[in-house]
């Protein structure tokens, strides 16, 4: 049985879906005002790998990941560029799809956009106001955190702890609030900003309400898994829980999952340190499958360190797996040995999607394959395991001239004409084709 580390309970829990053999997942997507950075990619790859393992186990996965296309950062960037917020969002949504495509990330079941859910957002906020859990102040609408049951339980904080931390705030927005911790559900329009009409005047939604509405509209009041980066645990996911459970009276998500941060050369990635890396730029020099392999093979909850050496190692390891995959098939192998690898792989991945252990099994299996155990059953199993990590190798076909040279070399060896055989081997090596003579015949790999 799959076990998931649930942030809410700080414990490993058996995964039991609401509907048998179906997984409903909502993962917070990017705010589309710029190209995604390596931290965004880490989250996208981590949850794509989790999705793929569920599918490997036979589940049907409804995978929802949103685009935040109404936000302060988008408004600022659009104004600076002299274009509309929609034009800016469209540009970076297209860039996101291109970049994640190169990372082998499967398209989501749906990618909802905030601009398409404005009526539903207004209705959601209205319900909270009517219930007395939200209030209007100068055109803004705020959520009353003091009325929320066990607010900040996800972050393992008490309301009293948070109030002490917020006690010194004196900005203009705080003056409009009943409590400094109250958060905006709806923001009154400002000059030069995109806005929509509402019962409280023209404005736009706050960030937290957007995800609550899109998740519940598509997947229902209670979902199986809600995920995102560790930085979203508080306040974003905390506020999603407060407003969603207040409105519906139901548990918002049964499992909360958060991926770890990405460091660059052992330092936290930030623009101020000058180590902020976009995926768009990185893909100019690093193959998308290599970057994917680096990100996917680290245990998703742990921080990872991005270095040139780590990328180089990922490239070398991926090449080994590719060469293994391209080996010619052998006679039928011991199926009990194959089953041992499959069982060990499942045991690793069932343990909170431990890809670090899972990839170790993959390399152990590759070593076994290279020792002459590679019939069609093994190849099919190997490919399915690779696909969990988002790795798909195309079948490589040698051109006729190279195939002819390999045949000529085999004939020369059969006739004990080793000088000709060695010459052909060197000629093929110059073209990047490495030959391996085994008891099953000649195998080749491409450097």
Segments and roles (model prediction):
Residues 97-119, 233, 288-290, 295-296, ...:
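Non-catalytic interaction-recognition regions
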């Amino acid at each position: 049985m799959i076990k998931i580390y649930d942030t809410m309970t700080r414990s490993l829990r058996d995964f039991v879906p609401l509907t048998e053999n179906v997984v409903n997942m909502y993962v917070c997507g990017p705010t589309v005002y710029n190209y995604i950075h390596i931290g965004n990619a880490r989250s996208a790859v981590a949850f794509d790998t989790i999705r793929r393992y569920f599918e490997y186990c036979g589940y049907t996965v409804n995978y929802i990941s949103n685009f935040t296309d109404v936000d302060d950062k988008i408004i600022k960037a659009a104004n600076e560029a002299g274009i509309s917020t929609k034009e800016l969002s469209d540009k970076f949504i297209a860039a996101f799809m291109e970049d994640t495509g190169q990372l082998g990330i499967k398209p989501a079941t749906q990618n909802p956009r905030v601009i398409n859910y404005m009526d539903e957002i207004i209705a959601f906020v209205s319900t909270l106001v009517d219930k007395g859990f939200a209030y209007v102040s100068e055109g803004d609408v705020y959520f009353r955190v003091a009325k929320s049951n066990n607010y900040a339980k996800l972050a393992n904080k008490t309301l009293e702890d948070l109030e002490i931390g917020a006690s010194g705030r004196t900005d203009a927005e705080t003056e409009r609030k009943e409590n400094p911790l109250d958060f905006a559900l709806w923001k009154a329009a400002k000059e030069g900003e995109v806005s929509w009409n509402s019962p409280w005047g023209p404005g736009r939604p706050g960030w937290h309400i957007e995800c609550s509405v899109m998740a519940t509209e598509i997947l229902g009041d209670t979902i199986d898994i809600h995920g995102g980066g560790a930085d979203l645990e508080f306040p974003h996911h905390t506020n999603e829980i407060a407003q969603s459970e207040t409105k519906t009276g139901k548990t918002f998500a049964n499992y909360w999952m958060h991926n770890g941060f990405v460091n660059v050369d052992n330092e936290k990635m930030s623009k101020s340190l000058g180590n902020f890396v976009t995926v768009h730029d990185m893909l100019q020099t690093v193959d998308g499958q290599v970057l994917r392999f680096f990100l996917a093979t680290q245990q998703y909850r742990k921080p990872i360190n991005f270095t040139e050496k780590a990328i180089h190692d990922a490239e070398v390891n991926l090449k080994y797996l590719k060469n293994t995959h391209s080996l010619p098939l052998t006679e039928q192998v011991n199926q009990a040995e194959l089953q041992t690898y499959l069982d060990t792989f499942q045991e690793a991945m069932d343990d909170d999607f431990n890809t670090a252990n899972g990839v170790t099994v993959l390399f152990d299996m590759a070593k076994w394959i290279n020792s002459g155990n590679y019939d069609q059953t093994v190849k099919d199993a190997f490919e399915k395991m690779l696909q969990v990590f988002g790795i798909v190798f195309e079948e490589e076909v040698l051109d006729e001239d190279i195939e002819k040279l390999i045949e000529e070399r085999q004939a020369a060896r059969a006739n004990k004409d080793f000088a000709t055989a060695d010459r052909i081997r060197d000629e093929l090596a110059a073209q990047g084709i490495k030959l391996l003579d085994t008891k099953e015949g000649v195998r080749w790999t491409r450097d």
